[in-house]
Amino acid sequence: MKQSFQNTRYRAILLLTGLMLAMTAMAQTLTNDALDLSGMWRFQLDPMGFGKTPGSELYLDKLSETIMLPGSTDQGGKGIKNTARYVDRLSRKFEYQGAAWYQREVVIPEDWADREIYLKLERCHWETTVYVDDKEAGMKEHLSTPNTFVLTPLLAPGIHTLTICVNNTLKYPMDQWNHGTTEYTQTNWNGIAGDISLYAKEKAHIRQINVYPDVSSKAVEVSVQPAPLKTGQTGKLELCIREQGGKIIVRQTLNADSLQVHAGIRQTLPMGNRVKLWDEFTPYLYEIEASWNVDGKTDTQTRTFGMRNVEQGKHHIRLNGRDIHLRGVLDCAVFPLTGYPSTNVDDWKRIF
């Protein structure tokens, strides 16, 4: 009788484990080498900031609450309930300042075994630390641009626990009227408001391209950062700049070994004597295409850029040798329902 009970118990545990794995797999959507991680996450507030303290590490625990992402703690009803209502600023239903922890399982496909894996967290507020299982993967604090983490060494195929600590404590000196953290424009919200995804790339790929126009020399300096090569490997980089109509201005090819790739590849490309400058009235753009080939596999990326020179004048900012006046509108509190800026293109089209 006892043996039968134990067998039944073990079968039940195996069944529940299988169901949990299936639910985890269903909660992530694989599309075009990317895993969409939006949806329900486990959650826990950490107002005292003990979650990174040895012996109290929250990334080692299974968090007890839940919250939807993308979103904020305000939207999830987390924090201190606020009954005050204001006429001169946004009125938050819930307020929270401090560390908040978000957690879920992810399933890495088998065909990602020999690829570079990145985590993209768009529009975080603010300091964001990522953990995979029991290892810290890094910390970033970008606001308007995505926080991107390289997780390749930590994500073998299979199931892993991904934990993210977002801390909206004001760690830098701020003016009391600043637009990034006060209710007069948005709020000091905590969360991740945009794209949350894992994506995979071939080992041979371009991580970053930067273009630096130099109007005085009629040239651009191009900085290309490929993913690291193995010792002894070499890659071939082809750079091509085109006018808007497609006419090729310059094309160059160069080889790089693992040490050069580690340092980053920089190359100056001439734009010719008839280079067209960019300003708000004649916003002429060029396109640069970078193709990186390693062992027969190629990653090609493009960027657009304008040739312009910005400098400080006596009383004005100067653009291409002329004094300019910058104009704009003060779009305060244009997202009152969320308290944070949208990452949806249609929302910005409506405003513009």
List where the protein language model places each region:
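Secreted/periplasmic carbohydrate-active enzymes, especially glycoside hydrolases
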Residues: 1-18, 25-352
